[in-house]
Amino acid sequence: MASRDLRAEVDFVLLQLLGDLEQLEAKRQALNARVEEGWLSLSKARYAMGAKSVGPLQYASHMEPQVRVGTSESQDGLQKFWMVRAGTQTPEEVGSREAALRRRKGLPRTPEPDSSPAPQNPLKWFGILVPHSLRQAQASFREGLQLAADMASLQSRITWGQSQLQELQEKLKQLEPRAP
């Protein structure tokens, strides 16, 4: 009876693992398409604006990332990745700043300037009126970043599923004696 339940669990984990592998392959193809699309749009923008107008000389001297990768780990060891925009705050940042007691009618205060200004759009480095292909390139690369975070989560889930499958197979081998 226990052997039958264990086999059903192995089948379930295996089907889930195969589904995750299919999703990973689809996301890889989509990522490749987005990156290819982004480079093609970037080359179109270089052609439209001139090769010297879109290049490393136009980059800002001090670059700030517009997105970051957030991670979390569940109790069973499964990691999840997601994209975090640079202007947003995490709950830890909000809570620590507003932890002090508040007065209802206190002394008028001047608002504190934000320590981190809103990130500037990198398209502004290339001028005010940039070609549409440059905006398309930026959008393609942003979609690619989101796909990369999704792929990292899927890869983590696949690795976790493989370890679960190996554990279940070991248990199954211990329960079933080998036939002579």
Swiss-Prot record:
Gene3D superfamilies xrefs: 1.10.287.3240
In residue numbers, the region (Disordered) covers 89-123
Main subcellular location of this protein, as a coarse class: other
* A GO CC annotation given for this chain: COPI-coated vesicle
MF terms in GO: unfolded protein binding
Q: Note whether Coiled coil occurs among the keywords.
A: yes
Under the heading InterPro entries, the entry gives: Vma22/CCDC115
GO terms for biological process?
Answer: cellular response to increased oxygen levels; intracellular iron ion homeostasis; lysosomal lumen acidification; lysosomal protein catabolic process; vacuolar proton-transporting V-type ATPase complex assembly
Name of this protein: Vacuolar ATPase assembly protein VMA22
Organism of provenance: Bos taurus
